[in-house]
């Protein structure tokens, strides 16, 4: 859950729950990633919240919002963790009001 703003300082709420789709084709890389993920869960959560806070209500209300937001989260988390194993973001909950 995060605050989302619109021009004119109108405050909105975004409640979003995500799961990550990770490339599991290499068992060794996947196991290393799961360790990296566990060690950096706070940073990962913070990065996802930051991506959401950078969005406006108008951006989050568009039909392609989940696709664009998912791509941005994938890019930012892969950069944060110095990996390319995160391939997809799955939205369990996507509520903007």
Model-derived segments and spans:
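Amphipathic, coiled-coil-like alpha-helical scaffolding segments used for oligomerization/assembly
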Residues: 54-97
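Generic short beta-strand segments
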Residues: 1-3
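Amphipathic, interface-forming alpha-helical segments with heptad-repeat character
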Residues: 5-61, 71
